[in-house]
Amino acid sequence: MITNLLLKSAGLLPVTTNISTWWNFGSMLMVCLAIQIATGFFLAMHYTANITLAFSSIVHIVRDVPYGWLMQNLHAIGASMFFACIYIHVARGLYYGSYMYKKTWSSGIMILLTLMATAFFGYVLPWGQMSFLAATVITNLLTTIPYLGTFLTTWLSGGFAINDPTLTRFFALHLILPSMVTALSSIHIMLLHETGSSNPLGTNPNIDKTQFHPYHTYKDLLMLSILILILLSITSFIPDILNDPENFSKANPLVTPQHIKPEWYFLFAYSISRSIPNKLGGAFALAMSIMILFSLPLTHTSNLRTMTFRPTAQYLFWTLITTFLLLTWTATKPVEIPFTTVSQGASLMYFSFFIMLPLPGLMENKTSKPN
């Protein structure tokens, strides 16, 4: 009865007629979350949160557990698909002015922050070489927090160094945070249904609407089919393409690779952090690389909502996308010239976008006034 009620309410939901394919990523993210929770549940049955057994338990899952290789690869590749979808979702919201729905936008950024924390804790669990070093570096950044830094680092690590209690804590957090992501997603959807969705033209969405089913259902199903096809293709043929070779070795505190490289979806923030030759400054820049998204509703100055009819703002937007890709690339390189210089310049350009974004709006408003 409840399911029928939900399906009926979703099917009859009034939706703007002119939303494009870029609006499909919300439903794709819901499917990604469901896949991650389902595969994570089966993996947790066989995983052992112990520094001497964690790496071996992953090997056991892949080699001995029936379809364990599929669960492990779906979970790992699914995380990458999840972040690819959420970054596109955020970029769409940025381009089409969805951030003007302040509550919906803020809840979305909270989901992104929680998701990044979940992914970080999950990356540590295999206890490979890169997992161990990532845990060491990131937990050490907490020491930069005034007054509470040392206490928080000791509490999260479960001691004065990364050890068995750290892995147990990370496993517990990795299990509980998806529930928080699900709860925040529910709030995000409720707020979205309260305000309605934006549209490519930035016009009043209440002027022209149609019911969600069947017009938008089939459009969503097409994109979901493409998503699942890509996910299964990568899982079946090139499952290790996104994995770091260092992480195929068991963690050894006495061995340090040439440079530390997290998963690709953290690389842009990591590049910003390491471009500043100061621990406190790097930690602050790392946090601000995401937190600065909260400022967008406050700095919107244009009379037009979207960037569809704003060429100058479009130029800034695509500069931001290029900067994001450049930061991702530089983070894969060693900390040496010229890569450090490029990452510093790209970091400056990244934050400059948010400072300069109000300027085109002010110029447009001035030039569009009637004589």
Curated annotation (Swiss-Prot):
Record-listed a ubiquinone binding positions: H193
Cofactor: binding details: Binds 2 heme b groups non-covalently.
Membrane topology per record: Multi-pass membrane protein
Positions with a binding annotation for heme b b562: H75, H174
Binding site for heme b b566: H89, H188
GO annotation (BP), single: mitochondrial electron transport, ubiquinol to cytochrome c
Molecular function as annotated in GO: metal ion binding; ubiquinol-cytochrome-c reductase activity
Transmembrane parts of this sequence: 25-45, 69-90, 105-125, 170-190, 218-238, 280-300, 312-332, 339-358
Residues of the signal peptide: none
Coarse class of the protein's main subcellular location: mitochondrion
PROSITE patterns hit by this protein: CYTB_CTER, CYTB_NTER
Keyword Transmembrane helix (UniProt): yes
One Pfam family recorded for the sequence: Cytochrome_B
Function: Component of the ubiquinol-cytochrome c reductase complex (complex III or cytochrome b-c1 complex) that is part of the mitochondrial respiratory chain. The b-c1 complex mediates electron transfer from ubiquinol to cytochrome c. Contributes to the generation of a proton gradient across the mitochondrial membrane that is then used for ATP synthesis.
Annotated family: Belongs to the cytochrome b family.
Protein name, entry field: Cytochrome b
Source organism of this protein record: Anilius scytale (Coral cylinder snake)
Lineage: Eukaryota, Metazoa, Chordata, Craniata, Vertebrata
